[in-house]
């Protein structure tokens, strides 16, 4: 977050590296940068953890704030699962796919601004997608956004059918 008495760029920029999956995030940020990590959060914390991570992003951005996110392709998940037995087990349980992530972020109130870059070096050829937070503060994500709040249907996520 920018301090209220900040000077001009570059002294008004603060970087914070932290594990959002452990503990709470109380600060409000103008920009959240997520590079090469959605796959690892998804594999280690499952579908529920990924949705919780996205909810924390929405709650942690100032109104109108930006998240720039590199969403790894499903193929890279298959490569990662070979690293350990626990990742293979986790991989087999995942229902959310990378192609679903934009839809989930938009459902949580974010606006997709589209891709801004396509990496071409060192084996990374992934786009960085940009999302903008709603113009008003999100106080809390409604309970209906806890997992499971969607059912996987043929190549889509859809709200559960009322019973």
Q: What is the meaning of each model-derived region?
A:
Residues 22-32:
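A short acidic, Gly/Pro-enriched loop at the edge of an enzyme's catalytic core
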Residues 30-47:
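A short SAM/SAH-binding and catalytic strip from SAM-dependent methyltransferases
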Residues 114-160:
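Core SAM-dependent methyltransferase catalytic element
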Residues 40-43, 75-80:
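Short catalytic/ligand-binding loop motif for oxyanion handling, primarily in non-cytosolic enzymes
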Residues 49-63:
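A short glycine-rich, Lys/Arg-flanked "PGG" loop and its adjoining helix->strand segment in the class I
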Residues 1-23:
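S-adenosyl-L-methionine
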Residues 80-116, 121-123, 142:
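Conserved Class I S-adenosyl-L-methionine
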């Amino acid at each position: 977050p920018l301090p209220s008495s900040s000077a001009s760029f570059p002294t008004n920029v603060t970087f914070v590296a932290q594990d959002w999956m452990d503990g709470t995030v109380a600060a409000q940020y103008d920009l959240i940068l997520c590079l090469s990590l959605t796959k690892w959060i998804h594999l280690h914390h499952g579908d529920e953890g990924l949705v919780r991570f996205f909810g924390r992003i929405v709650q942690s951005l100032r109104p109108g704030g930006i998240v720039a996110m590199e969403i790894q392709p499903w193929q890279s998940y298959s490569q990662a699962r070979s690293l350990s037995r626990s990742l293979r087990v986790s991989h087999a349980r995942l229902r959310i796919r990378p192609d679903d992530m934009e839809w989930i972020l938009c459902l949580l109130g974010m606006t997709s601004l589209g891709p801004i870059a396509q990496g071409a070096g060192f084996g990374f050829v992934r786009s960085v997608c940009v999302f903008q937070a709603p113009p008003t503060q999100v106080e809390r994500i409604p309970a209906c956004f806890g997992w499971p709040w969607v059912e996987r249907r043929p190549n889509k996520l859809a709200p559960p059918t009322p019973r």
